[in-house]
Amino acid sequence: LVGSEMCIRDRFNAHLENKEAIEQRQEAIRELSTDLEYRQQIRLSGLLYKGKPADTSEIKEWANSPSYYRKHRLLRMIPATVSVINLLCISLTCLDILPASIAGGVFACFVVFSSVFSKGITKLQATYGKKLQILSTYADQILLTEKKDMHSPVLQELKAELTSRNQTASQAVRRLSKLMNALDQRNNLLISMLLNGLIFWELRQVMKIEQWKEVHASDLPRWIETVGEIDAYCSLATFAYNHPEYIYPKINSHSFHMQAKALGHPLMDRNKCVRNGIDIDKRPFFIIITGANMAGKSTYLRTVGVNYLLACMGAPVWADEMEIYPARLVTSLRTNDSLTDNESYFFAELKRLKLIIDKLEAGEEHFIILDEILKGTNSMDKQ
């Protein structure tokens, strides 16, 4: 799902720096990694309709937008009034009190009158109809989570978010999905004319959708975010399941200590990867990596950075043992120049270094990885 992809991306960009939060996330990932059936069901339901990146944000925007039709009292009365008039005309016609031509004329007038609202309803259907197809996927995933017993505190909190007033979240979301799918019946011109002439069906249907929105306007964005969070946990749990030899690192919150044995890069071939250790526990807390070209210095730095990031996300790492002090990871591994911004590679690296210095001087704690900084520039210019 798009929501889960955003959650995973956010976890990479803004990883945890709190020991308790990381350990709680480790517990949640451990729990889900043992439930293969649940994760496969979540994965399968998410593949049915993944949606587009803009879908979830536009659905949230729709949920927070004011109702258009229900805010007018007169418009709210129209469907019921039309239904009563048609029922009266049909009854009088059956009793031979009213000519059928008059009843037919009234019906035709209502068909024409209903077309006044068609443009706005068509716009609503065109804008959100396809996007709300993803709601059935959310409903399926919510239902799976509602039925599952959660044990870790993090997962219990997420499950508690999937609540509503007098019905489950899955029932509420499925109700909206059915309302939007029913609105598609207006694409059948014959049925649309018949229902609009009799009960102003399109306007009635849109008002039901707006009524749902008024009740669950604050719930829907929360449910979407919660489903994305759970799906993201399932992705990390699948990563843990696929690598049973990986270990969950120890988190140290007292003083800086970065120590690991036999670190390996998760993307490298396990048969070819040369695993190395790291140990930083003494002031001034830095190490310098030197060696010949193509000796693997950059790969080593990336290995340390990737595993450190995974550790701060609560995920397992490829190591025999590992202990970290969680801090913000800052790197200068792939600095790029920019012709449009008139920035050379050298200037871009200087800006990055200035940013790091400013953060450190502000008292922020960081784990910093620099790879061949200011390379390609002679020593005099570097000074």
Say what each PLM segment does.
Residues 1-2, 6-7:
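Short, small-residue-biased leader/transition segments that mark boundaries at the very start
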Residues 37-40, 146, 231, 238:
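Coiled-coil heptad-register positions
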Residues 65-227:
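A conserved P-loop NTPase coupling/switch region
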Residues 114-117, 236, 242-383:
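ATPase nucleotide-binding head domains, primarily ABC-like/P-loop NTPase cores
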Residues 139, 143, 231, 354-357:
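Structural signal for well-ordered, non-membrane alpha-helices
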Residues 219-241:
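Interdomain "pre-motor" coupling segment immediately N-terminal to P-loop NTPase/helicase cores
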